[in-house]
Amino acid sequence: MKILLIGSGGREHALAWKLAQSPQVQTVYVAPGNGGTATAKQTAAGIENLPITGLQELADFAKREKIHLTVVGPEAPLAAGIVDVFRNNGLRIFGPTQLAAQLESSKDFSKAFMKRHGIPTADYQTFSSALEAHAYIDAKGAPIVIKADGLAAGKGVVVAMSLEEAHAAVDMMLADNKLGNAGARVVIEEFLTGEEASFIVLVDGKNVLALATSQDHKRLLDADQGPNTGGMGAYSPAPVVTPEIHARALREVIMPTVKGMQADGIPYTGFLYAGLMISPDGKIKTLEFNCRMGDPETQPIMARLRSDLVNALDHAVDGTLNEVELEWDRRTALGVVLAAHNYPDTPRAGDVITGIPADTEDQITFHAGTKLQDGKVVTSGGRVMCVVGLADTVRGAQQKAYEAISHIQFDGMQYRKDIGYRAIK
């Protein structure tokens, strides 16, 4: 069978790598793909890049090539309604409809949904007037969190530790319109403390299948300093998610979300990612929903998945996820992101990457912002690669990842040296 995967990031390289391992699969087409999927030789099935991004063109390709299943990686095509287009063309696709994807594409929709269905989350208020937002911040004080309502590629959240920072964030979004439509409304919410974890599940409309837990590192610099990024590294499993917290997350967050979407007449199918804040006494609050797998969490999660992903996704599309169990590698997987010069601001592109090691049983390199140019792999985006190490402990996995990184070189390469530190006591 043939599979179509939408996207071009590290998450998509990891998904393509896993999908191509299925004995059922002949070709995985990645649209548009990256330098890693362009040079993927490590799997039994072929992985091919497809230079198409238009939704109808992708649907036409899927029809013409008799694609068995389409899997959507990033949020933008979901918010644009790719699932609706494919379903209207009678095609099998895994992901939420445009309406259901509002759980991620509108923070206001998501918060109102949680409030309506009793899902634990931070107190909040939504504003489109800068004047009213400033008054609210003055009344509430800092620290406080300012979020753009719409999709802002991971750059729409400001955790303001001071009033000045909070007011500046409101001005940036509402007054100066720096994020365009995404920042035309802002959600302002209370600051939560605790440990964050990423809880990612497959949903078939009614049934849920949990993937391995993970924890990521959002800040650019060691010791969680510097600006927020899309994520500088992640590891799986997340020790903070104990069996009790796992059960609680399913009971208090995931199942009420799936049932709530059904009750609201917009049943949810697809990956569902709940960003959770776990307080020291084990209480959970939902920070955000994403309608996709996290990046870089996908890379260590896929590195640990032993089961056939195609089989699980087929069951999800058919509404029979209750018949599936997943098997996981007992080892810890830890991924470290290598970023381009000047990231998270406008990154430099075109730097030649050398020394990429061959994948082994315990070291895997997933590409993100790379492309193939004149036979060489060069940087083409902010987060360039994610290097994953596997070992029996977090420390061991960390050592494997950094050992592999020691061979890789490109001008301006930046990465954190402490990924996983929270789990290494």
Regions found by a protein language model. Name each.
Residues 160-298:
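Internal nucleotide-binding/catalytic subdomain
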Residues 165-168, 344-347, 392-399:
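Short, conserved charged micro-motifs
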Residues 370-374, 379-425:
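Generic C-terminus detector
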Residues 21-23, 38-39, 94, 116-118, ...:
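Solvent-exposed alpha-helices and their adjacent loops that cap or buttress functional pockets
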